[in-house]
Amino acid sequence: NFYLSIVNPAFEELKSELKKHGRTVEVYTERRDFASIIVQFEGEEELDYSIEVMLYPGLAFPRPVVHFTEWASSRRLRVEGLFRTGIQDYDISDITKDEIIEHFLNEYRNLSSQHNKRIDFKS
């Protein structure tokens, strides 16, 4: 199972590292088609990152989704992304734990730098 063998271990590793930096982290992995990790700092949500699997005939396509609150307007935004650029000829069997971690960290760094809350993660 993609979530049990790839996503959940990635999220647990991220949780452990983020807690070292004073973050409160919740990981939700109960569903078979969705998992999320929510990061808070000083009572405010910094990032809600999830992975959904889109099912198409002959393809199970993993899609990272970021939910966050826009700082200036307080609007709740949803951004759907891709794990890889270029021709999207991959499915859940091609995505690794390290790719999930790297994608999460890139999104987290981008958002945290906008709010001047940078964390120096070991890459």
Predicted regions and their residues:
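Arginine residue identity/basic-tract feature
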Residues: 23, 31-32, 63, 75-78, ...
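Contiguous, amphipathic alpha-helical segments that mediate oligomerization or scaffolding
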Residues: 1-25
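Glycine-rich, aromatic-bearing surface loops/beta-hairpins
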Residues: 96, 100-123
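Ser/Thr-rich, low-complexity intrinsically disordered terminal regions
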Residues: 23-47
